[in-house]
Swiss-Prot record:
Family named by the database record: Belongs to the short-chain dehydrogenases/reductases (SDR) family.
Domain of life the protein comes from: Bacteria
Protein encoded by which gene: chcB1
EC number of the protein: 1.1.1.226
Activity versus pH, per record: Optimum pH is 8.0 for dehydrogenation and 6.4 for the reverse reaction.
Species, as recorded: Sinomonas cyclohexanicum (Corynebacterium cyclohexanicum)
Short name of any one Pfam family annotated for the protein: adh_short_C2
Name of protein: Trans-4-hydroxycyclohexanecarboxylate dehydrogenase
Length: 259
């Protein structure tokens, strides 16, 4: 299969949590539009299989692999520096970082488990910080785009999601602050806030769609199309933005018709 376009031609993108779900979709869409992709994850078998699939599909006429799998524990800074180093060694640079890895946890302040709280913050927020810290030295010379995946739980309150919401709000704050700090290097930093998306992580959730004006979950492709835009030069004057992609769920209070 040949490329769909050259919107991110020859850019090098590292995506955390990319072995499956939204991360895998992001990697495939970026590769389809010309990027070299680094699939970073703890899931070795799935990550390597995805890299092989992308290489088989998108190296036609190029004569080399366009995807690389690297083992990554997002809570470990040395793991991050090794992943960035592998990306630069293989492809020569790093242009795009997609901080996609995350976990979804439940619990109010009253009943949340303390260890689970710490684990959620460590993966969903500190993991983003460590990824950015590791990536910036590789991006400083030529600039780049950092895309932090948050959630609508980082835009509004979320009942019974204390740790998850705290982490996702933290991602928004980290994004805005880092956009100010890294702007002089022409490194753009934006956050993406999906609503409910059809992924393995959300497959078991039971919910209605009364609060979503568009009346459905998002497809992973729809989120990936936004990632593609932010990774490309089409968004060259966007930084510090928090972009909701939620079918209108955070647009307002969708009251019952008889209210």
């Amino acid at each position: 299969m040949s490329r769909v376009s050259d919107r991110v031609a020859e850019k090098v993108a590292l995506i955390s949590g990319a072995a499956r779900g939204m991360g895998a979709s992001h990697a495939q869409v970026l590769a389809a539009h010309g990027a070299n992709v680094v699939i970073a994850d703890l899931l070795e078998d799935e990550g390597r299989a995805l890299a092989e699939k992308i290489n088989a599909e998108f190296n036609t006429g190029i004569g080399r692999d366009v995807a690389l799998f690297v083992h990554l524990d997002v809570t470990d800074y040395e793991s991050w520096t090794a992943a960035v180093g592998a990306a630069v060694e293989r492809f020569g640079t790093l242009d795009v970082l997609v901080n996609n890895a995350g976990i979804f946890t439940r619990g109010s302040v009253e009943d949340a488990d303390v260890d689970e709280w710490r684990r959620t913050i460590e993966i969903d927020l500190t993991g983003n910080f460590l990824g950015m810290k590791a990536a910036v030295p590789a991006m400083k010379a030529a600039g780049g785009s950092i895309i932090n995946i948050s959630s609508i739980a980082g835009l509004v309150g979320f009942k019974n999601r204390a740790a998850y919401a705290a982490a996702k709000w933290g991602v928004q704050g980290l994004t805005k602050t880092s956009a100010m700090d890294l702007g002089p290097y022409n490194i753009r930093v934006n956050s993406v806030h999906p609503g409910s998306v059809k992924t393995p992580m959300t497959a078991g959730l039971k919910r209605g769609f009364g609060q979503i004006p568009l009346g459905r979950d998002a497809e992973t492709q729809e989120i990936s199309d936004l990632i593609l835009f932010l990774a490309s030069d089409e968004s060259s004057f966007m930084t510090g933005a928090n972009l909701a992609i939620d079918g209108g769920e955070t647009a307002g209070n969708n009251l019952r018709q008889d209210a």
